[in-house]
């Protein structure tokens, strides 16, 4: 008979990997911000470009990080529920 439900350990490992990926993306976002702000570029184009990074692109990446963390929590919660049902 095929298994129905979650492989709890597999779910927890997946959630951990998703959390790790979110952390790596968060660190990458910080490094990219340093790169974008770290070279000499003066003028209105520079201001607009850097403002676009801060207000749009960086914000999008930050939202992805939050979504990944939320999804990881969802998987962990599902694993906990599966464990309770299985016991």
Feature roles, as predicted:
Residues 1-87:
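N-terminal secretion-targeting helices of virulence/extracellular proteins
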